[in-house]
Amino acid sequence: MASLDKVYKQIEDFARECDAEKVVLFGSRARGNNLPKSDIDIAVAGCRYFGRFSYLIEERLDTLLDVDVVNLDESLSQQLLDEIARDGVILYEKI
């Protein structure tokens, strides 16, 4: 299993490959109050190939941790959107 920095770099590479606008880490890992086996929560915006991105995260990401991916271009609860806005850490943003 790769270090989290390497995992985040892989996520960035997948975002670039799938033409995403932005990827945001949220949840306990973004807040810094995670446990060692806590999952990785990421939100993706403007991803042209979201299905491919999800596939790469599920099948190719070098981690044994669970990864939850939400698509910010779909309808999400206001509570979740508020959490992402409050706690989110940008992992990738297209320039």
Predicted region positions:
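Catalytic core of pol beta-like nucleotidyltransferases
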Residues: 1-22, 30-36, 45-95
